[in-house]
Amino acid sequence: MLFKMTEPEAKPISPPRSEITLPCRDARGSPLRLGLGDEIWQGHILVTGGTGSGKTTVIRQLLARCRDIWPDASFIVLDVKGDYIPYRRPGDKVFSFYGGEDAFRWNILEEARASPHPEDELDEMVSVLFASRVNTAGQNRFFVDAARQVFYGYLLVTMRQWQCRAGRPAPTHAEMAKWLKKCTLEQMQDRLNFEKDELGGVTSLLKGREAASILSEVHLFAHDFFRGAGDGCDSVAEFLTHPGRALYLQYDAARAESGRLGCSILLNRAIAQLLSKDWCRRRVVFILDEAASLPADYGLERLLALGRAQGARVLCAFQNQDQVEAMFAGRPSMQSDANNVLSQFSSVMAFHPNSDRDVEFARARLGKTDMIVTTFGLSRYEPPHAAAVQDCPVTARQLMALKAGEAYVRLRDYAPAKVYFEKEQCDGK
């Protein structure tokens, strides 16, 4: 069997002129500068490949180049395995449970205050924080949704009392956690009664037979959300006013639920700032390695679909379709939502896959092209049979034969090709 591409003319594999390039070698071993400038970033970049395939090393190099060439851009980096934080630069911040001199200590009340409509912003943040819990609650959905309303009521009262005391700092997460973890049903009712006219319906939830179960849900959420909480008054809105800085979100697998909550809400706030009508359309680059570690409730679909004109540039790394669908677990439209997200990426880098599912995923994302398939008969007297088909120009065998650092790339409308990325050091702290 013989495959033949039917492209009318040879295309380059990347833009001939680009402000950002990575050193690599083509399939023949010749040096090549792969163009990955803004023309490519505007269509977002998808990276596939298994563990140890070299994709993180290449992403790290690309991040360093972007920071050098775009000094006025902001960067949000999801760091699941600690591969990026060692390369941080002066002025960068790290969100984690371990503190440190450059720690980003987020405060939900300070984040709300940065908005022109702080109470609406607070309600939106609480909805995002509870979204995954509500979607996966099943028959317990009532209790989780009621806990969301109670938690919002508590934060609303706390914020209004703080705003009445001019000049005083916002209550810290540590202070709020200390009160929430030990509060009784009566204490929570008394707290909500400070805004009785507005929160009367919420207070009534704590007077029925389900009151104890609802408060228990609040305690469970507070335990996860405030785990490792400390003193601090940082906000994403304020962070993004400083060009050239990077915020690293250190997802800790040992504290999976707390990590999901913290990283998801910070991504959501960055996306909300980017999509607001007041945003200055300055570039914000999102590097989401191991993106499937977080549910998509933080607004990934909106970021990809609407963010380009506002300055969003997104790189996501997935291994297979199952990972993407798992981000939408609990939604009736899980599969279609996953496909919608994947359709937003116009450039693909496919590194060595680890399984058949990974191979299928990479070939599907690399796309199809017109090909002539010629089948030769068993007898020399039998004429060959030729048929026109559409198929991926990269075979499963070719993908499985990739070595560490090698990848098949398809950048927007350019031709797919195999490249080997050169190793180099990334400047950092």
Model-derived regions, located:
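Interdomain "pre-motor" coupling segment immediately N-terminal to P-loop NTPase/helicase cores
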Residues: 1-5
